[in-house]
Amino acid sequence: MSDQFVSQSGRTLSEFISRFQLQQPQPGSFSANSHHAAVLIPIVCRPEPTLLLTRRSDHLRKHAGQVAFPGGKADPQDSSLIETALREAEEEVAIPASAVHVLGQLAPLDSSSGFQVTPIVGLVPDNITFHGNEEEVAGLFEIPLYEALRLSRYYWLDIHRGGVNHRVYLSWYESQFIWGLTAAIIRRLAQQVNI
């Protein structure tokens, strides 16, 4: 672990890193879903650490206008899902892959669009200028890490779709509505570090 990440962001980020590393995720349950994707959970190392999130462009075919982490489908040339997440983050929000300090990954989650999505947790220095790829990203925003990890901010709705019951998580931050897979990923991270 580079001292720059800890010293720039203080004790609270060090505590998060320690808890994350001490409580590694349990292996996910088997899924017959053979389509793989990965997202980067970018933790920006500010004096008060933040999560960087995107609002997807309104013209996209899937998940248009939704809040999401940068990420996408694994390409055949990707050597790992970590590489997938880093490649997508560079394409979508201009985070150089070389600038990300990967802490680890969470267990995969199944998406409503048929992908098994693996969240990759990474630290990003605060001196990077983030800008969204206009074709994919309508906007960027940050939420304080410890606000995002407060479990009491997440609500759920049980829905019946396609003959199957699903629990959908949702939350708000200022004017941003965070729901679905993105809310489920943040909630899972919060459960793992138990802050």
Swiss-Prot record:
Its cofactor is Mn(2+); Mg(2+). Residues 34-165 form the Nudix hydrolase domain. The keyword rRNA processing does not apply. Pfam families: NUDIX. A motif (Nudix box) lies at residues 72-94. One of its GO terms (biological process) is nucleoside diphosphate metabolic process. Its EC number is 3.6.1.-. Belongs to the Nudix hydrolase family. PCD1 subfamily. This is Uncharacterized Nudix hydrolase NudL. Probably mediates the hydrolysis of some nucleoside diphosphate derivatives. Mg(2+) binds at residues 88, 92. CDD domains: NUDIX_CoAse_Nudt7. It comes from the Bacteria. Keywords: Hydrolase, Magnesium, Manganese, Metal-binding.
